[in-house]
Amino acid sequence: MSIPITNFTQKEFCCKCGCGSCEVSMKLKETLQIIRNYWGKPIIITSSRRCRTHNARVGGVPNSQHLLGTAADITTEGSIQTFYNFIIQLYKSGKIPDLGYIQLYLNKKFIHVDVRYPKSNTVRNLK
């Protein structure tokens, strides 16, 4: 199944250091687009693809899904907790089957989502 990616540009997925690393999984793009379609409001990608240098600079783990282009940190206007709960409901209802992992960073106001395989089946809330 191919979903048109209408609300995100390729540049939004690129490493924030400017190195030009932009390759991300189509499953990640489609998962984010599905979330955006149901949410009906803009979603901001604060981090997606990372090169090893930038990943180390921001404190990412050495085996980060960001290095593989299978993860994104996202936020939106309003309550991040409400947005997180919304994504969980989409997953539970089968709307985003490729979601492999989700973690809420409440104090930092972003949500990490990835499409790792095999799925970790772990949902984490960090405050």
What are these regions (language model features)?
Residues 1-38, 116-127:
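Extracytoplasmic cell-surface/polysaccharide-interacting catalytic and binding patches
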Residues 6, 52, 56, 63-65:
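Flexible, active-site-adjacent loop/turn segments at secondary-structure boundaries
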Residues 6-9, 31, 46, 53, ...:
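Residue-identity detector for threonine
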Residues 22-29, 48, 68, 77:
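Generic alpha-helical scaffold signal
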Residues 23-25, 52-55, 90-94:
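A short linear-motif detector with a strong N-terminal bias
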Residues 30-59:
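Extended, low-complexity, intrinsically disordered C-terminal regulatory tails
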Residues 63, 67-71, 76-127:
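Catalytic cores and adjacent binding grooves of peptidoglycan-active enzymes
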